[in-house]
Amino acid sequence: LRWQERLAQTLFAHLPRSLAGAQRLGWVLGWLWWLASPRYRADLAGTLATAGMTNPRLHRQAIGACGVQIVEALWVWQQPWPDVLDTVREVVGWEAVEAARGRGGGLLFLTPHLGCFEITSLWAGERLPITILYRPPRQPWLAKWLTAGRARGGVTLA
């Protein structure tokens, strides 16, 4: 096994049951990754500079947030579907979706990778059939987890 797969297996085996616990773990891992990888530090600094984010406080937040995003996705993929749906606290604008469905025809959701976007499709798939267009991961070993975690409820992958 490659080291990335071994790390992912270890994370899966030891993920906290709570989303808050997973987020704390992700914050720590984001910082460890940043400390351990000169290439990642350079890439992140370049990305933030390109975005015009020069505030050191924002840099520190981004370091932790990158780890949180990765661990949140793993958490969502691993948890039972009802437990994931229970984490949704507020939905804004769903009435527009219902109105569009009432007029017939299809809908296209564009979901940016902000926050824990992995939950968005599962929540929508609970209410209507949904197909996700995605690019399979470059790491073949990751595909089994991604597929199992995303293709649940009314969600189909394409």
Protein language model regions, located:
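Catalytic core of membrane glycerolipid acyltransferases/transacylases, capturing the structured
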Residues: 103-158
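Membrane-anchoring hydrophobic helices of lipid-metabolizing enzymes
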Residues: 1-111, 143-149, 154
